[in-house]
């Protein structure tokens, strides 16, 4: 069940307007960051703020439409977007799910981070101000075909993406925290290719 939540969260698993400084940070990040790599933690909280799930891993993306998220603890899961298809590999189950990339992502955080820089096309943008010395931004997806109601993003003084929060219609909140962010690293094209392991069950297209 938790793994299902994890994959749904990702698909829901990467906007927005604040005061002038935050607008500049967001647009600068989207326009100038063609690729990135970071460690992350992902915490899922229920409507009462109780932790349901906590996982850690490494993410990479390269525009347009390529990304790789490796969930490492407490279990392994790999999510890859190769520009055309979305691959989800559950290591424990040796099971692969594959979908068309556009159908899998839509107006999602992953689409935002690894897609084009036309932010306003998929999101309604509003100001949420400054908290804990971070500029917070809110994005509400224009499409109704998403499993979340809004995304919050926070940038530090260096215009680095530090936190993302996803809120869904059940009151759940998923908090992604990024560390050791590297902007525009040279990433191997092999990172964004996926071949199902021998013997794996493949579901989908």
Predicted segments — roles?
Residues 1-4:
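Positively charged n-region of N-terminal signal peptides that target proteins for export
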Residues 7-16:
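Bacterial N-terminal signal peptides
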Residues 21-46, 50-52, 80, 89-149, ...:
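Flexible, processing/modification-adjacent segments and terminal tails
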Residues 44, 61-63, 159:
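Beta-strand elements of well-folded, non-transmembrane domains
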Residues 52-58:
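Amphipathic hydrophobic-ligand
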Residues 58-107, 174:
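An acidic-aromatic
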Residues 121-126, 130-205:
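Gly/Pro-enriched, hydrophobic low-complexity segments
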